[in-house]
Amino acid sequence: MKLEFTNDVPIYIQIAQSIEDSILKEIFKENEMIPSTTEISVKYKINPATVAKGFNLLVDEGVIYKKRGIGMFVSEGSKDLLMNKRKERFFKDYIIALLEEAKKLNISKEDIIKMLEREV
């Protein structure tokens, strides 16, 4: 897990996103323990409450779960859950915006496909 904080997104959200990325890349696998609040807060010199807030986002979404007295673990099926969540966000954030801009510029679907094929 690697974190390089930016000012435009709250740190607790960046922590949650970094853990999500690590799950998607299978750095953290399902039913595996993730670094503790203390480990992350010490390593990145941030408040443990901020780390806990990021963890709580993921617990609420069912991505990770807590084993009392042991630590936080990646939930079964979390990779698929995150893939679906990210695909939906990608569609809303990028595809819809692309289609709206293409419509304004009178770019056909065929032209969009040609542009994409040229870049891939």
Residue ranges with predicted function:
Residues 1-33, 39, 89-119:
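Extreme N-terminal segment that seeds HTH/winged-HTH DNA-binding domains in transcriptional regulators
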Residues 8-9, 26-27, 42, 69-72, ...:
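Short hydrophobic/aromatic-rich motifs at helix boundaries and adjacent loops
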Residues 12, 16, 36, 72-87:
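Short, cationic-aromatic polyanion-contact patches
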Residues 27-28, 32, 60-69, 73-76:
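Beta-hairpin "wing" of winged helix-turn-helix
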Residues 33-65:
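N-terminal helix-turn-helix
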Residues 54, 67-69, 88, 110:
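Hydrophobic alpha-helical segments, especially transmembrane helices
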Residues 58, 119-120:
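The DNA-recognition helices of helix-turn-helix-type DNA-binding domains
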